[in-house]
Structures are given as structure tokens and as C-alpha cells.
Swiss-Prot record:
The gene is FSHB. PANTHER family: FOLLITROPIN SUBUNIT BETA, GLYCOPROTEIN HORMONE BETA CHAIN. Heterodimer. The active follitropin is a heterodimer composed of an alpha chain/CGA shared with other hormones and a unique beta chain/FSHB shown here. One of its GO terms (molecular function) is follicle-stimulating hormone activity. This is Follitropin subunit beta.
Length: 129
């Protein structure tokens, strides 16, 4: 019986204390309207799981905030998109996560939808290598 209790406590501790929200390398498609194509770049972003719960009884006095794995700190990097027309602005600035945490999704800076377009979406349909 003590083994079952220990295992249960261990699982609870693991779920609460050991959030696996961490930096991960991803490839994103970047595009410039003036260039009419996309290129792929490697960057760092946050991914993983956070402890959350959905209460059965909704309490209007206590808002239900679902925590998500999101950035805590960002830096911005700039890359020159090759092959653009000479008159076009070929610089593209994108965010790079440097620290992650479990927190409320900030819809002012993040796509908080269930199914966003995804990091490899290209509206022009053409990827250049």
C-alpha cells in the first residue's frame, strides 16, 4: 500500500514541479511582400507542457486561466532575404525566445488559437532554398 501511495505522490510532484516547458529549435518560413517568395530559417522558441486544470464548477469570482508554454524573454534578430528586387526592403526581423515559462498566453504578441497557421506556412506557396 505504501508503494502505491508513494507512486501517486511522485506522479503529483512530477506533474506540478517538473513542467517540461523549454527552449527548442524550430524552422520557420519568413516572407516579404516585396520579394514574393519565402525562405526557411532556424530559430529558438518555447515548446512543452504546463500543468493546468479545467474546473468542473465555474466560479465567476475566480477566472479560469489556462497556462501555456510561452516565452519569458525575447530578442530580435534580423536577416537579409536574398533574391529580392533591388528597390525592395530585403531585411526581415523575427523574434527569438531566450527564456521560457508556463504562463498566460499574451494575445497581443502570440497566436493563442488552438490551430494557428504554423511556423512553415508560406502565403506565396513558393519556398526558396
Amino acid at each position: 500500500m505504501k508503494t502505491v501511495q508513494f507512486f501517486f505522490l511522485f506522479c503529483c510532484w512530477k506533474a506540478i514541479c517538473c513542467n517540461s516547458c523549454e527552449l527548442t529549435n524550430i524552422t520557420i518560413a519568413i516572407e516579404k511582400e516585396e520579394c514574393r517568395f519565402c525562405i526557411s530559417i532556424n530559430t529558438t522558441w518555447c515548446a512543452g507542457y504546463c500543468y493546468t486544470r479545467d474546473l468542473v464548477y465555474k466560479d465567476p469570482a475566480r477566472p479560469n486561466i489556462q497556462k501555456t508554454c510561452t516565452f519569458k524573454e525575447l530578442v530580435y534578430e534580423t536577416v537579409r532575404v536574398p533574391g529580392c528586387a533591388h528597390h525592395a526592403d530585403s531585411l526581415y526581423t523575427y523574434p527569438v525566445a531566450t527564456q521560457c515559462h508556463c504562463g498566460k498566453c499574451d494575445s497581443d504578441s502570440t497566436d493563442c488559437t488552438v490551430r494557428g497557421l504554423g511556423p512553415s506556412y508560406c502565403s506565396f506557396g513558393e519556398m526558396k532554398e
